[in-house]
Structure formats: structure tokens, C-alpha cells
Amino acid sequence: MSWQAYVDDHLMCDIEGHEDHRLTAAAIVGHDGSVWAQSATFPQFKPVEMNGIMTDFNEPGHLAPTGLHLGGTKYMVIQGEAGAVIRGKKGSGGITIKKTGQALVFGIYEEPVTPGQCNMVVERLGDYLIEQGL
């Protein structure tokens, strides 16, 4: 399966039991900041933004004082899982980022999608990639 198919079929899909509820944007990005695949709506990010995200995975709490920035949008960092998941909130939406051995899985959402639904979609794919050694 291509990386784009993972984004299209496993991240940008209808959320179980909620037809027409789906993430607004998603991507799989290498630890080096290279985009493996992304939705058409995923924001163009700056290398410094990706560096900040990677630093927070290695030094949990790094982004808490300044917020998480992606594509110029600032998210307030909320409780995640140290070294594994970063979660952010902005207004009625937010972001979930799951770290795997080689990549970061991103999901961005707006209402009516809930934070829990975004977490489920992103973390399920991230866990699968980890099981595959990726």
C-alpha cells in the first residue's frame, strides 16, 4: 500500500459510526521533516515548526510554554503521552500527532469531529505502523 493510500483510506476516511465526519487534514511525515504523504488540505509547514515538534517528543513539555505551531497556526498543547503523542487544541478544533519509529502521523480536526475521534484515528494508524517496524 502506498503512503498516500494510508492517508486517504485510514486518516481521511469517515469516522466509525459517523458518516461524513472526517479529519480536516492529515499527513505522514518522516522524522527528518520529509512529507511521505498528505491530504490536499494539510498545511505547508516550516522546518522550524517540525523541529519544535520533534524536540517535544524527545523533551516532553518543550512546546507547552510557546504552543505547537504548524503551518503558521498555533495550537495550545494539551495532555498527550510523553514521547509518543502530542495533542493540541485551537478553538473548536485541534491536532493529534503520533510518533512511530520513523514517522509522525498527523491528524487535524474541526467540529463535529471530537478530540477523542481524532486521537482514535491517528493513534490506530500510528500503532499499526509501529507494529510493522515503521
Curated annotation (Swiss-Prot):
Post-translational modification, as annotated: Phosphorylated by MAP kinases.
Example GO molecular function: actin monomer binding
The keyword GTP-binding belongs to this UniProt entry's keyword annotation: no
Main location as per UniProt: cytoplasm
SMART domains assigned: PROF (SM00392)
Keyword Disulfide bond: yes
Highest rank taxon of the organism: Eukaryota
Stored InterPro entries: PFN, PFN_euk, PFN_sf, Profilin_CS
Positions bearing Phosphothreonine: T114
Location of the motif Involved in PIP2 interaction: 84-100
One cellular component (GO) term of this entry: cytoskeleton
Pfam families noted in UniProt: Profilin (PF00235)
Disulphides: C13-C118
Keywords linked to the UniProt accession: Actin-binding, Allergen, Cytoplasm, Cytoskeleton, Disulfide bond, Phosphoprotein
Subcellular location: Cytoplasm, Cytoskeleton
Subunit structure: Occurs in many kinds of cells as a complex with monomeric actin in a 1:1 ratio.
Note: The variability of the residues taking part of IgE-binding epitopes might be responsible of the difference in cross-reactivity among olive pollen cultivars, and between distantly related pollen species, leading to a variable range of allergy reactions among atopic patients.
The protein's role, per its UniProt record: Binds to actin and affects the structure of the cytoskeleton. At high concentrations, profilin prevents the polymerization of actin, whereas it enhances it at low concentrations.
Family per record: Belongs to the profilin family.
Record-given protein name: Profilin-4
Source organism (scientific name): Olea europaea (Common olive)
